[in-house]
C-alpha cells in the first residue's frame, strides 16, 4: 500500500488548484493527484470536449487569478472554447510542476477510513494497489457522476451514450448518424442539439414535462452590447438576487427589505426575462414554445430547471431553422434495432441516443454509513436530528428574504430534499463536515461540490480557505453554529432555485457574496476595486484577486510574529514544511 500525506481526487479546476495551493503553503508535502480520465481538465478533459462546446463565461472571467488564459478560439461574444480551456489546464499542470504528482487513468472504487493505528483514509483503486493518505481532498466536482437512465431493451442495436462521451463519438456521428435522439433538458442537451443541428442531423429531443420547466437560457449579450456574464459579475446585478450570504448594507435593506425596493427587484427580473424571451423568440414555433422558462413571467429568476447562457451567438437561428422535433414525454423502451418507444404512444427511428440527463453526486465511493457521517447523505436519524435546525433555517430565510416567500409551486415531492439522492451536502461553507471539524478532524475537504458558473475563482478561494484550515492555521465556529449555517444555506437555495436548490448547492447569480464570505473568513478584504463606482458597476474578474495568496501569507506571518515574538517566517504544521514567503 502506497502512503501519501495528501491525495487529491480529481484533476479539474478544483483539484488542480487545491493541489497547487497546498504545495505553495506546504511545499514538502508528499501529495498525489488521481483522476480516472486520460487527460487533465475534468469536464474539460480532451475526451469530453468537441468543436462547438464553449464555457458559459466570457474570457477574462474564466481563468485563475494569477495565470492568464490565452485568447485562442474565442467566440464572437467572448466565450471560451472547450479546446482552449483544456489546453489552459494542461499548461497550468505543467507550469506549476504538478505533472510528477499526477496519476491519470486511476479510478477510485472505494474510500474508507484508514487503520485505527494510522488514521487517515484508504482509497481502493481499480486495477491498482490501495492508497493510504493522512488527508483527503475530494475534488470530483458536481459533474463527474453521469445519470444514465435505463429502459427495457429488446434487440436495440444503436449506441446509447451520455453527453459526457459526446466528444468520443464525433467521428461516428459525422459518418453514421442521420437522426439522433437527445434525452433531457439540462444545459448539455442544448449544447448537444446545437452541435447535431450544425452537423445537419435530424434531432428528436425528448424531455419530460413538469411545472419546473426547461432550462432557462439567457441571450449571450445584453441587447447586443454587453456580455451577459459580465453583467452578472457586477455587485449591482448581484444585489438584485435575494441571497442569504448578503443580508446587510443599503442595497440589501432597500431591494430586499423595502416594499418599493422589492418592486424594483421584480421589475428588474421581469425585464431580464423579457429580454431572454425576445432573444429566443419562443413564440415562433410550437417546438420553441416548449423550451420557454417557467413561470413565464420570471422564469429566468427562479431557474428551477437550471440557468445558463446561449454561448453560440446563432443558437436560436440554428434551432429555428433546424430539423428538430421536441417530444414532451419520456422514453418507455428501446426495441427493434433502432426504435425509441415513447410513453405518449409514439415511436421514433434513431441512429444514436444521447443522454443529457445531468449528473448525480459522485459519492458512491463512500459506504452508506460513511456518507451519512460526512453529511453527504441523510438517513432517518440525521433527518430527525436536523429537523429543528431546518425549521429554524426556513424561518430565518423567510424573515431576511421576504421576496422568496412567494415561490411558485413545484411538481417535485415536497420531501425530496430529505432523500439521499436529492439533498444538498450539509457542509459548513460547502467544504467542511461540521461534526468532524468540531472534533478536530481536519483530514477531509470537499471543494467543487457546488453549482457556480464562475468556476476558476471559486476553486481558488475554496482551495485557500480549505488548505489553510487543513494545515491548522484557522479555527472554525462551534459545531452548532456550523450546522446552522449549513441548514440555513440549504433552506435558502431550496427557496431561491427551487428544484435545482433541492438537489444541489446552487447559486448561479450569487457567486460574489460567496466569494466575499470566504474572503472575510480568511481575513482578506473582499472589496477589490479602486472606487465606489467600479465596485458596483464594473465586472469582477479573477485578476482582481491575483494577490490573495500573498495577502494571506502576510496575515499569517503577522499573526505568528504577534504570538511568538520571534519574527520567524516559517513553521512546521501538521507534519509539513510550511512556506510563509
UniProtKB/Swiss-Prot annotation:
Matching Pfam families: Pyr_redox_3
InterPro entries in alphabetical order: FAD/NAD-bd_sf (IPR036188), FMO-like (IPR050346)
Induction annotation: Expression is positively regulated by the depudecin biosynthesis cluster-specific transcription activator DEP6.
Record's keyword annotation contains NADP: yes
Cofactor: FAD
EC number from the UniProt entry: 1.-.-.-
Positions that bind NADP(+): 54-56, 183-202, 219-220, 351-352
Keywords from the UniProt entry: FAD, Flavoprotein, Monooxygenase, NADP, Oxidoreductase
GO molecular function: monooxygenase activity
Positions bound to FAD: 43-46, 108, 470
Family affiliation: Belongs to the FAD-binding monooxygenase family.
Role of this protein: FAD-dependent monooxygenase; part of the gene cluster that mediates the biosynthesis of depudecin, a highly oxidized eleven-carbon linear polyketide that acts as a histone deacetylase (HDAC) inhibitor and makes a small contribution to pathogenesis. The reducing polyketide synthase DEP5 is the central enzyme in depudecin biosynthesis by yielding the backbone polyketide chain. The monooxygenases DEP2 and DEP4, as well as the uncharacterized protein DEP1, then act as tailoring enzymes to modify the intermediate polyketide chain into depudecin.
Name of the featured protein: FAD-dependent monooxygenase DEP4
Organism: Alternaria brassicicola
